[in-house]
Design a protein with these regions (language model features):
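Short, well-ordered alpha-helical microsegments
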Residues: 99, 125-128
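Short conserved beta-strand segments at catalytic cores or DNA/RNA-binding microdomains
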Residues: 48, 66, 70-82, 90-91
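Beta-sheet entry/capping signal
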Residues: 54-55, 82, 115-117, 138-141
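Short Cys/His-based metal-binding microdomains
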Residues: 81-85, 145
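Acidic/histidine-rich, metal-coordinating catalytic segments
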Residues: 115-125, 145
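Hydrophobic, aromatic-enriched, well-ordered structural segments
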Residues: 1-40, 44-47, 131-140, 147-327
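Active-site beta-loop-alpha junctions of metal-dependent nucleic acid enzymes
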Residues: 65-67, 88-111
Length: 327
């Protein structure tokens, strides 16, 4: 930080805490007592987490300044299936020790309430830290991160054919026994059947398959979140407010404006939902009639699609056991 910024930051957070009783912040210092990382969450973020904490996404892809420091954010879906922010931090680096501090601080802020599922990048330090701090929580690897990492690690081999094969493994392979066959097909079609050990990134990706392939992910509650759509949309939103040449003081000012804009958009959606009648294509279904008035249009549309899909299946009784088959 430039001279004087540390003092300004601490003053900023002290004023926030005085004006907002529920405002929570913590500062990590290094060996010489300099500020290293900063976490904060206001009362509304804490309330939103208490409401929408089942599935969250952790993102560090947005870089806040010319020193390439990451803005870390916990995000989730609100009742309109739009991004909602639960807490943020400016991190000095992306080591396991820094992630440990951030996750412990976040949970302390949220009364140690853990989510059911957390989506993250496949960085080794992050995987280690999440496994350590979020014990008992399913951690999925975001497919968007996988695609970005594939481009960095595989170069020209990460072409359209490869991404078609990877997308199939992520979303369409629903049986663990089928995974190896489809993986071998990808290696044959895209890598000329070369051993997986020739590609370090593929070794790591295969090792962590239970965190990203539908064959395993289907057993966990994900609220329909398989990619980093939350992170992508929030990063695009951030770029409209934050620039790399902003000073730390200007950053916090613009960040607060951005958060308020997100909340204004949510209030607008709440107003429209209260004034709009949600369309139900199954008026004779007791199930659909019972939920149509309880959900926002966006959430009901998600349920509606799942209900549509249910008609693709039937059951047959076979030797006393029930099993499902698709038409």
């Amino acid at each position: 930080m430039v001279r004087g910024e540390a003092t300004v930051i601490q003053e900023f957070f002290r004023n926030e805490a005085l004006s907002k009783p529920s405002f929570y912040y913590d500062i990590q210092v290094d060996a010489v007592e300099d500020i290293a990382s900063i976490f904060w969450a206001d009362g509304i973020m804490q309330l939103d987490y208490s409401l929408f904490d089942n599935v969250i996404s952790f993102d560090t892809t947005y870089r806040t300044n010319n020193q390439y420091r990451p803005l870390a954010a916990f995000l989730g879906f609100d009742n309109h299936r739009k991004s909602v922010l639960f807490g943020a931090a400016l991190l000095y680096d992306e080591t396991a020790a820094t992630f440990d501090w951030f996750f412990i601080t976040f949970l302390k802020c949220m009364s140690n309430k853990k989510p059911q599922t957390i989506y993250i990048d496949q960085a080794t330090a992050l995987l280690m830290s999440v496994s350590n701090i979020f014990q008992g929580v399913f951690h999925g690897i975001c497919s968007w991160y996988m695609s970005e990492n594939a481009k960095k690690n595989l170069g020209s081999r990460a072409n359209n054919a490869f991404f078609d094969e990877l997308t199939n493994l992520i979303s369409n392979v629903d049986d663990e026994s089928d995974f190896d066959y489809n993986w071998d097909q990808m290696m044959k079609n895209c890598f000329n059947g070369r051993p997986i050990s020739d590609f370090t990134w593929l070794v790591q990706t295969h090792r962590n398959r239970m965190h990203w392939s539908s064959a395993w992910v289907k057993s966990h509650f994900t609220a329909g979140l398989k990619t980093t759509s939350l992170s992508e949309s929030s990063n695009a939103f951030l770029r409209g407010f934050l620039q790399p040449d902003h000073s730390i003081v200007l950053f916090f000012s613009h960040f607060n404006i951005m958060v308020q804009r997100m909340r204004d958009n949510h209030a607008d959606l709440d107003f429209k939902a209260a004034k709009t009648r949600t369309k139900n294509n199954y008026p004779n279904s007791q199930l659909m009639r019972s939920v149509v008035k309880k959900y926002t249009s966006a959430s009901f549309a998600f349920i509606h699609r799942q209900y549509d899909l249910s008609f693709k299946y039937y059951y047959e009784e076979c030797r006393g056991d029930f099993w499902m088959s698709s038409y």
